[in-house]
Amino acid sequence: EGSVSTVPGSYKEFITNDRQIREARKNIWKCIEHIEHLSARTGKKLHLGLEPEPMCYLETTSEAVKFFDQMRKDRKGDLRIDEHLGINYDCCHLAIEYENPHEALGRLVSHKIKISKIHLSSALKVHPTMKVREALKGFSDEVYFHQVIERRVGGEIFRYRDLPDALAANPSNQPHLPEEWRIHFHIPLHHLPTGLFDSTVDHLLGTLDFLKSKPGICSHLEMETYTWEVMPESMKQRSVVDQLVDEYRWTLEQMSRHGLLDKA
């Protein structure tokens, strides 16, 4: 069996009309057809996973469900979509959207959407005080895009394209101060909370809980921390190799605790 993840259609701001979405769906159907032929030729079970990401065309599981519903309407009765297209569930991305892993994964499963792959990943989570905002400057870089989703005290959600945009916002001008920021910065899975920074590793652990309760829904789990070279100096005290070893150990320990090592 083989899986490949890909972008969730496009970046939301790039979409200006329905024609673009129709073309995207047509292209994805072309991918499904190609994967079907490739599967037949190789004798392997192959599938493509669309990976929802903050501020992209598909960024939540609800949006993913609506998209798959439309894909199925385009070609009623064509079951190849169930075999060769699914969702690549990135724990970091869906945690940033404040989704509950049991509800999010349950939503996909109940709509018979394949879980093509799961990215075991964790996002940066903070209460954005002035001290925290100052410390967050160390996470800004010119390599990756770090979207920020802010939850305000009343529950309202506000999005920033990138971390520098969020840091530039003047909190004194905001009528509703933010309660929490979740930042698209993949941090090591074994990272321990500090006085300033926390992580969304609880979403990852909830995902493992779901996999334990629903064995067999996904056999492709992938550690997805890739930001080693752009982390603040305070998180680069040890070599990348040593940190990768620790991340592997942590992941295997958590999978063992959830009884998943023999099922994954």
Model-inferred region functions:
Residues 1, 34-46, 79-81, 111, ...:
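A structural motif corresponding to the C-terminal end of an alpha-helix
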Residues 1-86, 96:
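Active-site acidic/histidine proton-transfer and metal-coordination neighborhood
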Residues 8-13, 52-56, 91-95, 122-126, ...:
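Active-site-proximal loop/turn and secondary-structure-junction residues that shape catalytic pockets
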Residues 21-34, 101-104, 200-208, 241-251:
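Well-ordered, non-membrane alpha-helical segments in soluble/globular domains
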Residues 58-63, 101, 232-240:
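Short glycine/threonine-rich loop-to-helix capping motif typified by GTGT followed
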Residues 64-69, 79-210, 216:
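Active-site capping/gating regions of soluble enzymes
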Residues 184, 218-225:
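Conserved active-site loop/cleft motifs that coordinate metal ions or position small ligands
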Residues 227-264:
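Aromatic-rich peripheral "rim/lid" segments of glycoside hydrolase catalytic domains that contact
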